[in-house]
Amino acid sequence: LKKHRELDLRNQASTNLFFQEERPDYVVLAAAKVGGIQANRTQMADFIMENMQIECNVLSAAHETKVKKLLFLGSSCLYPKEAEQPVKETAILSGSCEPTNEGFAIAKIAGIRMCEYYHKQYGDNFISCIPANVYGPGDDFDPQTGHVISSLLARMHYAKMNHLPK
């Protein structure tokens, strides 16, 4: 397990070298450029480009080194803005993405499709799942740039620590 500062998955040569040296049997691709609504709104090109770079580099390296199984983590934000609730996986690409995170969503959709295509074309055991919402260590808890859940937790913690009204 490597941190971003140890391995930049946006760099194809570094990614290939890591896979060639480590020869992992199983890969969980959870790495992504992520951010809250404001970051997604102002860095659309960065979100689609960096996430596509990560996905292309990792899937290609996993294929070349014959990884036994790869799990790609999608995102609930890739569903259309007006998807029927409760949302079903078949809703992907059935409508327009939420404009505030469209770049990120399109990259995640591409990652899911790449897993499917590697499986169909080469027989690679690349699968994907779409977790509802996650947070934890290393998440961005800043109310201006973080995701909703982590930002709300940070705001509640701040209010409690500073004895602010509920």
Task: Name every feature range the model reports, one short phrase each.
Residues 1-7:
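A short beta-strand-loop structural module common to alpha/beta enzyme folds
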Residues 2, 27-33, 70-76, 129-131:
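SDR active-site strand-loop-helix element
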Residues 9-52, 64:
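NAD(P)H-binding glycine-rich loop region in Rossmannoid oxidoreductase-like domains
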Residues 56-101, 127:
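Conserved Rossmann-fold NAD(P)-dependent oxidoreductase catalytic core, especially the SDR/UDP-sugar
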Residues 82-91, 116-166:
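NAD(P)-dependent short-chain dehydrogenase/reductase
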Residues 103, 107-110:
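Active-site helix of classical SDR
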